[in-house]
Each structure stands twice: as structure tokens, then as C-alpha cells.
């Protein structure tokens, strides 16, 4: 039987080579407060509900 390498401490996606992180500062993070995230979510939900009420499916 072939032995499998153990990647201890690594995320499975990183170990499989699906994600490559070459530099720590390479990825920019979006900083969003929890209140802003909830407000944006509620605004999107309200917009979708309003569109469904105003434009019902044929």
C-alpha cells in the first residue's frame, strides 16, 4: 500500500494545491462592521421582496 503524506497544520485546500498563498499581504481584506453587514443584507432582502411584489412572475 502506498503511504499518504500527512499535511499537519494545513488546510486541506492548501494541501491539495487548490489555493496558493505566496505572500501574506497579497490578499486585501474587506473590513465591514457586523451592523453594516446586517444592514446591507436587509436592504438586499427588501429590494428583492419589493421587486417580487411590483413585478410578479408571468
Swiss-Prot record:
Regions that span the bilayer: 34-55
Keyword line: Cell membrane, Membrane, Protein transport, Translocation, Transmembrane, Transmembrane helix, Transport
Topology Cytoplasmic: residue spans: 1-33
KW Thylakoid (keyword) present: no
Membrane topology: Single-pass membrane protein
Main location: membrane
GO CC terms of this entry: plasma membrane
Subcellular location: Cell membrane
Ranges facing Extracellular side: 56-58
InterPro entries, A to Z: Preprot_translocase_SecG, SecG/Sec61-beta/Sbh
Keyword Nucleotidyltransferase attached: no
GO terms, biological process: protein transport
Entry function: Involved in protein export. The function of the beta subunit is unknown, but it may be involved in stabilization of the trimeric complex.
Similarity annotation: Belongs to the SEC61-beta family.
Assembly description: Component of the protein translocase complex. Heterotrimer consisting of alpha (SecY), beta (SecG) and gamma (SecE) subunits. Can form oligomers of the heterotrimer.
NCBIfam families associated with the record: PRK01253.1
Name of the protein described by the UniProt record: Preprotein translocase subunit SecG
Source organism: Pyrobaculum calidifontis (strain DSM 21063 / JCM 11548 / VA1)
Amino acid at each position: 500500500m502506498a503511504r499518504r503524506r500527512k499535511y499537519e497544520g494545513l488546510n486541506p485546500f492548501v494541501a491539495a494545491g487548490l489555493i496558493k498563498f505566496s505572500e501574506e499581504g497579497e490578499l486585501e481584506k474587506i473590513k465591514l462592521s457586523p451592523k453594516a453587514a446586517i444592514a446591507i443584507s436587509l436592504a438586499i432582502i427588501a429590494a428583492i421582496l419589493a421587486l417580487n411584489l411590483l413585478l410578479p412572475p408571468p
